Amino acid sequence: MSRVGKSPIALQGAEVKLADGAITVKGPLGTITQAINPLVNVANNDGTLNLSPVDESREANALSGTMRAIIANAVHGVTKGFERKLTLVGVGYRAQAQGDKLNLSLGFSHPVVHQMPEGVKAETPTQTEIVIKGINKQQVGQVAAEVRGYRPPEPYKGKGVRYSDEVVILKETKKK
């Protein structure tokens, strides 16, 4: 059995409902509904969720670990939420959050406007910092990757949009 799939999920103040091959996790920050693979059994025991494969096949074993991680992320998301921090490095690079839009000046001849999907918010504590928050880990990471994709850090000066914990290894310029 999967090592990840064996460990139970503590619900930490989240409500869980199992119905029709789907699990609904409800917490103070919102609600997430996730389809459950038919190769995985989910049992709710007094504040913990236990997952187990239906049979001993490799596929069911692998999916029990995957489903456990997805459900654990949903529980974490509705109780504490997820956030990803981005930093803008470069002269004149700045960001401004306006409602559900993120306006970016990244050295192009035009401003870049990124529309935030539902359930994801962007904040700009300073002009060169962006904090993307939401309850869905996959969505938060996807939006952060899209924003970074507008101007990824270049290897010679390091200018561009980078994750705050990202280390950009700079190359040396060509010598004559």
From Swiss-Prot:
SUPFAM superfamilies: Ribosomal protein L6 (SSF56053). Disulfide bonds: none annotated. GO terms for molecular function: rRNA binding; structural constituent of ribosome. GO terms for cellular component: cytosolic large ribosomal subunit. Signal peptide: none annotated. Gene3D superfamilies: Ribosomal protein L6, alpha-beta domain. Keywords: Ribonucleoprotein, Ribosomal protein, RNA-binding, rRNA-binding. GO terms for biological process: cytoplasmic translation. Belongs to the universal ribosomal protein uL6 family. This is Large ribosomal subunit protein uL6.
